[in-house]
Amino acid sequence: MSSVIVKENETLDSALRRFKRNCAKAGIQQEIRKREHYEKPSVKRKKKSEAARKRKYN
């Protein structure tokens, strides 16, 4: 879980910006999108295989 302690004399905007940066580094948005809908194991394997194929040829 990402958390940010607001420092003294720090604006809310800069604290929010730091929080968003921490969330992006932790990969929270990608994880939420990935878990939004159930994905069958066969579909997961297919996506994993396609990603490996893309990495190999690019």
UniProtKB/Swiss-Prot annotation:
Protein name: Small ribosomal subunit protein bS21
Region feature Disordered, mapped onto this chain: 31-58
Biased composition (Basic and acidic residues): 31-42
NCBIfam families, sorted: S21p (TIGR00030)
GO annotation (BP), single: translation
Coiled coil: none
Pfam annotation, one family: Ribosomal_S21
Protein family (similarity comment): Belongs to the bacterial ribosomal protein bS21 family.
Entry keywords, A to Z: Ribonucleoprotein, Ribosomal protein
Gene3D superfamilies: Ribosomal protein S8
Organism from which the protein derives: Agathobacter rectalis (strain ATCC 33656 / DSM 3377 / JCM 17463 / KCTC 5835 / VPI 0990) (Eubacterium rectale)
UniProt-listed PANTHER family: MITOCHONDRIAL 28S RIBOSOMAL PROTEIN S21, SMALL RIBOSOMAL SUBUNIT PROTEIN BS21
A cellular component annotation (GO) from this entry: ribosome
Bias type Basic residues, positions: 43-58
Highest taxon in the source lineage: Bacteria
InterPro entries with a match to the protein in the record: Ribosomal_bS21 (IPR001911), Ribosomal_bS21_CS (IPR018278), Ribosomal_bS21_sf (IPR038380)
